[in-house]
Amino acid sequence: MSDKLKIGVVCICLNPNYWSFAPEMLWGLDTFFLKHPSIKDKYETEFMVWSDIPEKPEEIQQRLAEFLVNCGEAKTSLINQETVEILVEPNKKEELVKGVQNLLEMKKRVKVFPTESIEWPMPTLMRYHLFLQQEEYLRNFDYIFYIDVDMRITDWIGEDILGDGLTAAEHPMYALRRNYHPPYEPNPESSAYIRRPGRLIEEDGKKKFEQLYYAGGFQGGKTENFIEAMKEMRKNIDDDFSRNYVAIWNDETHWNKYLFGNSPAVVLNPSYIYPDSLVADYYVKLWGRNYSPKIMTLTKKFSTTAEGGKNVQQMMATM
């Protein structure tokens, strides 16, 4: 029996616009995630993906080609009334073939839980529902961490992420800011509602609001603690659904509500969820302190924000 701590890393990879991120994420995990030579022999890590990537290479290529059309990077040609041909430029064709190969190779090396396609923002909002479908499997691990698939790991991720409870990362847009109101859920009818502008704490004999806001893109902790958190957030999301409501920032809002009453054991700085669009000295210019990226959120060539509300409304109409 191995005495290594077992670490499970979970992510959602639904719809072709996100598929291409998964192989790079796996490379980053294999290279940097608890892999420093000084500690790597202490941990056994498994990457789990909830995905709708098809089994057959030709189906993967067809879905990716359709995505290129939607992005305006490929064209369609009508062959007859029933057949449409997708025309892909030679350089994009090579990229397409390589993308298929990368996905097939990745699927051989990770645990894939086949999942039906759902439109944004449902993949992120319903993440806890999906993960808890595999609760028995997840309980094989000592720690579980969730990471957005559209992230790039660029530096060593070490034992500082491991604590005696939950692990949360400060949101990069709100870290160190003073005199601001975190974007908590403002609607009292939502189960994610937070009345005060932060957690009330006492420091040097004085009471003040601790205005921390945590990012949803990297989170986790000890398995028992994280599963307990996921169950509570799943319940709260369902409660909101029953009232035909979705929290302002989806799952991230519910994560912050849970942490409001259940302080994380580990709070990571924004190095762990650092937008690639930030200038190098972003934090120095604003707040006099700098961070170097360990995990970067990647700018996408497609936009989901505008269509998110519409997709939720359509889903609500069927409930």
Where are these predicted regions, by residue range?
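N-terminal anchoring/stem segment of glycosyltransferases
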Residues: 1-123, 134-140, 300, 319
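Short, solvent-exposed loop/turn segments at secondary-structure junctions
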Residues: 14-16, 54-56, 117-118, 151-153, ...
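A structural signal for short, well-ordered beta-strand segments and their strand-loop junctions
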Residues: 48-49, 144-148, 153, 220, ...
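Conserved glycosyltransferase catalytic-site signature
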Residues: 124, 128, 150-151, 248-255
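GT-A fold catalytic core of metal-dependent nucleotide-sugar glycosyltransferases
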Residues: 126-179
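PAPS-dependent sulfotransferase catalytic domain
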Residues: 160-225, 232
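Catalytic core and acceptor-binding pocket of nucleotide-sugar-dependent glycosyltransferases
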Residues: 198-303
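Long, low-complexity C-terminal extensions of enzymes
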Residues: 300-319
